[in-house]
């Protein structure tokens, strides 16, 4: 029998339909590319590219796009045993516009409801979730039932499992206001608080950390996340780089990489997969954060998200090149 997986992620999956032309608004785009999408799915792909055994817990529609998701996961080396079909809803599709360096509007088609929000608690393989070395969940998974209860059930099962063999339980704060009733952060905060009580790592940008904590300054955000129960808080500050703070007060600040941005949408997911890779390797915060930051920078310089995830040698090469500058 195979041992525990390195990483199980839970949450969104879909198909990204991205323009193959940059600087062109959607009404004028003539050519598009089709890519596997969904943040936790991309995180699993990113970690698989780095040599980790990964799987995703999610749902697709029973349609050709759902078939594509299964096919793409297998091609990326991600275990799809917990990716099942839902008859009632179509596989989500996401369009974007690409205006480098920092304007990438997203258009989500997840109505009447996304299949990944109808994961039920009784469907979960709780022994596998508990045994996984890293478990990754997202804020979007908390936005609606039954996904909300399923996500919190998975977190509670890991916490009750005594953490034997576990490396980390990661909460990607992942704030998408369009998925929440009224887009109100106050409505999300109690559920974020419940998830943080079981997580050991929290990661998000300053705005997402603000939703979780009510704070707006990066250091205050990190301190509030630690007070909420996590052992490591990672705050992504955009052009100001990344701040990582541990429960013992150890603080690491990493500057951003100087890259020519093509599409910034996949950078955070590459960061997440690389973060999991470093956690699994037992790296100290500075090495962990530098590696994850470099992985995100590489993907920001590429068009796709899942297909753009870097291999370890590419990340190492970027870090080595910058070390000699």
Where are these regions (language model features)?
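Glycine-rich phosphate/adenosyl-contacting loop at the front of the ribokinase-like
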Residues: 1-79, 119-120, 260-262, 325
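Conserved phosphate-binding/catalytic region of the ribokinase-like
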Residues: 1-8, 156-157, 214-325
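Active-site metal-binding loops of divalent metal-dependent hydrolases
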Residues: 13, 140, 173, 270
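Conserved N-terminal subdomain of the carbohydrate kinase-like
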Residues: 53-139, 164-166, 317-325
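Flexible, glycine/proline-enriched loop segments at strand-loop-helix junctions
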Residues: 109-110, 134-146, 176-182
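Active-site beta-loop-alpha junctions enriched in small/polar residues
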Residues: 111, 140, 174-178, 207, ...
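Conserved phosphate/ATP/ADP-binding segment of small-molecule kinases
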Residues: 163-164, 177-251
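Hydrophobic faces of well-ordered beta-strands that scaffold small-molecule active sites
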Residues: 169-171, 202
């Amino acid at each position: 029998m195979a041992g525990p997986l390195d990483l199980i992620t839970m949450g969104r999956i879909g198909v990204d339909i991205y323009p193959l032309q940059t600087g062109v608004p959607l009404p004028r785009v003539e050519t598009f590319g089709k890519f596997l999408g969904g943040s936790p799915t991309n995180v699993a792909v990113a970690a698989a590219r780095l040599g980790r055994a990964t799987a995703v817990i999610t749902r697709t529609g029973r349609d050709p796009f759902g078939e594509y998701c299964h096919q793409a996961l297998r091609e990326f080396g991600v275990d799809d045993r917990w990716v099942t079909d839902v008859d009632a809803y179509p596989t989500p599709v996401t369009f974007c516009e690409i205006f480098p360096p920092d304007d990438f509007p997203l258009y989500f088609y997840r109505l009447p409801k996304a299949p990944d929000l109808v994961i039920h608690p009784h469907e979960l393989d709780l022994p596998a979730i508990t045994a996984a070395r890293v478990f990754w969940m997202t804020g979007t998974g908390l936005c609606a039932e039954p996904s909300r209860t399923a996500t919190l059930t998975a977190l509670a099962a890991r916490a009750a499992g005594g953490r034997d063999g576990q490396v980390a339980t990661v909460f990607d704060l992942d704030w998408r206001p369009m998925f929440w009733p009224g887009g109100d952060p106050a409505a999300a905060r109690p559920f974020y608080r419940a998830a943080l009580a079981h997580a050991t790592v929290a990661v998000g940008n300053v705005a997402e950390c603000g939703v979780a904590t009510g704070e707006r300054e990066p250091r205050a955000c990190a301190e509030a996340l630690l007070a909420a129960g996590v052992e490591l808080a990672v705050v992504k500050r955009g052009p100001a780089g990344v701040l990582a703070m541990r429960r013992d007060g150890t603080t690491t600040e990493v500057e951003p990489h100087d890259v020519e941005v093509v599409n910034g949408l996949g950078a955070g997911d590459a960061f997440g997969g690389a973060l999991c890779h470093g956690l699994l390797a037992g790296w100290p915060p500075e090495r962990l954060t530098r590696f994850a930051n470099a992985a995100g920078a590489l993907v920001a310089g590429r068009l796709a998200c899942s297909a753009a995830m870097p291999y370890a040698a590419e990340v190492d090469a970027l870090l080595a090149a910058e070390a000699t500058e």
